[in-house]
Amino acid sequence: MASHQSLACACGQVRLTATGQPIATVECCCDSCRKAGAMLQSMPQAPDVLGPHGQTLFVMHRKDRVSIDAGHSRLRALRLSSRGGSRRVLAGCCNTPLFLEFSGGHWLSLYGLLWPDSIRPAVEMRTMVSDLPDASVLPDDVPNLKTRSLRFYARLMKAWIAMGFRSPRIEVAGDTHV
């Protein structure tokens, strides 16, 4: 993958750049991602978020290696609850999901749909498959983890150490709780 990857929402008004290699490329099968994915893809003009088995593809990057180059004022956040520790950020202009951010997290889980198929990083693992009604439908092309693995957490820790234990803030104008 290129060291600088230009990404954009469907209409091009919000543009981001991801620099360097991703921390990991995962498909999340957790209940929250499936619920949020269904909500996001039901919005007007929104692209499909969920895969055929309810999974959401994320390309995880360090926050300090993702820049919002245009359209910052168009960012909107969706939270599944007012007390939720995560938010999904989308481009308000066209309802393209951009990233999932955890409160206090040092990384962004960028939605895989932002990459053209031809250059999208390959999936390395599926997480939280225990939340699926029937995990046996998943292909066995990558590890299907019941939760998350030590390797997954080790990658996150390595990135956080490299960042000097910082967790940059990303301001988003609109915040919606559902």
Each model region followed by its residue ranges:
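A short Gly-Trp-Pro
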Residues: 1-8, 14-178
